Amino acid sequence: MKRIVVGIIDTGLDTKCKYFLRTNYEACSVKQDGNVSLLKSDYEDKNGHGTACASIIINECPNVEFFIINAFGESGKTNLVAIEKALKILKETSVDIINMSFAITTAPGNELSDLCLELSKNKIVVAAAANNYDGRSFPACYESVCGVRGGKIKNS
């Protein structure tokens, strides 16, 4: 069976979480200025969102491997420089899927679109959150990206 590697751009990974004790992963962090850090203290998830996303994935696909990039830091905020750098890093790895559980609501420049298209042409599935309100969500609205949207089911 082919191993599946999922790249996650989010708030990092709680390496002490029981789900990841036997999971193969690589990790780094990208600062808002685009600098990369391999220090565990920098990619450790202090927010919980990235760990929650990875936990959902591993629950559905137990043999998955990860390349985790903390592009949000402790503040839970990021910028386009960090996101684009994270995508460039993942482009140079062996990921099969890239998960971005966030949306940018202001139209970015062409570089983000170009990166997503290039990843798609390289047979890498790129998935991103589509916001649940009016307006466009980037990069989910690009044709080369699978937009994922949550919602409430009536009577549940």
What is each model feature region?
Residues V30, A71, G150:
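Active-site donor-binding loop signature of nucleotide-sugar glycosyltransferases
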Residues I8, I68, A129:
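Generic enzyme active-site microenvironment
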Residues L39-I104:
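Subtilisin-like peptidase catalytic core
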Residues V5, E65, K123-A127:
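Proline-centered loop/turn at the N-terminus of a beta-strand
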